[in-house]
Design a protein with these regions (language model features):
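N-terminal, post-signal peptide beta-strand-biased segments of exported outer-membrane/organellar beta-barrel
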Residues: 1-93, 340, 366
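Outer-membrane beta-barrel porins/channels
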Residues: 3-8, 25, 70-406
Length: 406
């Protein structure tokens, strides 16, 4: 079920940690999950800069990311009213994307510099650009916490998550005159920059069981986090502004806070074998520090709305489905080629097969449809020419979990 914030199960280590105190059996509850994800990020860039002949032309850029295995682990030990829980997962970041034909921001920078330095005598039809760019960001999280059942209907949780961020960029751009014009190199850009940092997230939670209702909430405090560059290569043409170079300079530290996060959920038992839930998430992005105070350009934090239903067809088989709507407070100043977001809705479907009293298997599929985001500027990437970028994404995830309790 997509909306897991009020569920009482081993995955509550992340989604509803206070609810772990209401697990029906004492002992160990363990879950090992593997996810397989496929994502694309696409940019349609339209500007007269590409031809400089008075016509607006479009270039298409596509980044792909494929992760055949994304592992995670949830574990809890319950004894009487107490539960100690732990988990490991990739809790954030955009994964890795490879743009085989580069990014428009670097193409535009090269085209603008060539036009400026040649005083317009060298036009795009006279040279070729060979470029590629890879970007990655992963947030690895290790969580530990304690849940306590105060009475028959109320429980609480306190804990924390240690986050380690690993990100970076690697790519190149070489612009050369065509052989018919002599083959001279006009621009050479080389970049290899790794980034890392860590931070601690305090977490609290509460769960209330009221008859057929289960109400739950979780709050993750803002994580103060700086990432530091380890730059092995930073070669750029003369004339590139300092503001472009600074984010990739060796030793440079960049704010990259993880925003505070609130989850509120309600689950209802319609029938003994039929349950439904609704859930709301808020990410306080506007108060999470970013490079150049980029967060201040957002119009609001991120809102997510979720709903789900699950049905025990027979004792040994449960099926589920759900919906998620994600709304970002995006602005043109916030969106960049190396980090852009799109509001979306998602559909998820899953099933659990109970192999025995101790063993069960979960299987799930999650599909996301993104809204295009259009960004227009009269000074496209600082070139003095107009231009428009249309950002879009796709995402498909398949998951499989093996659960064991004893």
């Amino acid at each position: 079920m997509v909306a897991r914030g009020a569920s009482i199960d081993v995955d509550g280590v992340y989604s509803n940690p206070a609810g772990l105190a209401f697990l029906p059996k004492d002992g160990f509850h363990l879950s090992l999950t593997g996810q397989s994800a496929y994502q694309t990020r696409e940019i349609h860039a339209s500007t007269p800069l590409w031809t400089q002949d008075g016509n607006i032309t479009e270039k298409y850029y596509k980044g792909t990311a494929s992760a055949p295995l994304i592992p995670s682990f949830h574990g809890a030990y319950k004894r009487d009213n107490w539960v100690i829980s732990a988990g490991f997962a990739i809790t954030g970041g955009g994964g890795k994307a490879s743009f085989d034909n580069g990014l428009p921001m670097f193409d535009a920078m090269a085209a603008g510099l060539i036009a400026q330095q040649s005083q317009g005598l060298v036009t795009p039809s006279m040279y070729d650009i060979n470029t590629a760019m890879d970007g990655k960001q992963y947030i690895y999280g290790v969580q530990l916490g304690l849940s306590y059942k105060i009475n028959d209907w109320l429980s609480v949780f306190a804990g924390g998550r240690m986050n380690y961020v690993k990100s970076g960029y690697e790519g190149y751009l070489i612009a050369k005159m065509k052989e018919s014009y002599g083959g001279k190199t006009l621009a050479d850009l080389q970049l290899k920059c790794d980034q890392s940092g860590w931070g601690l997230t305090p977490i609290i939670g509460i769960d209330a069981k009221l008859g057929r209702w289960n109400l739950a909430a979780k709050y993750e405090f803002k994580t103060n986090l700086n990432i530091e560059n380890k730059t092995d290569k930073l070669l750029v043409p003369d004339g590139v502004p300092e503001s472009v170079l600074k984010p990739y300079a060796d030793g440079e530290q960049t704010p990259s806070d993880i925003p505070a996060y609130l989850s509120v959920a309600a689950g209802y038992e319609i029938l003994p074998n039929l349950r439904a839930s609704v859930e709301y998430h808020f990410f306080d992005d506007k108060r999470a520090g970013m490079l150049n105070d980029r967060q201040k350009t957002l119009t609001h934090g991120t809102h997510e709305y979720l709903a789900g239903i699950e049905w025990d067809i027979v004792k040994m088989l449960t099926v589920s489905g759900g919906f998620q709507k994600t709304s970002y407070g995006l602005s043109d100043d916030f969106q960049t080629d190396t980090s852009f977001y799109c509001s979306s809705y998602s559909l998820g479907f899953g099933a659990r097969a109970r192999l025995s009293e101790a063993w069960s298997i979960d299987i799930a599929y999650f599909w996301t449809n993104y809204e295009d985001y259009e960004k227009s500027s009269d000074n496209y990437n600082g070139t003095g020419m107009p231009g428009t970028d249309v950002y879009s994404r796709t995402n498909k995830v398949f998951g499989l979990s093996l659960n064991y309790q004893f």
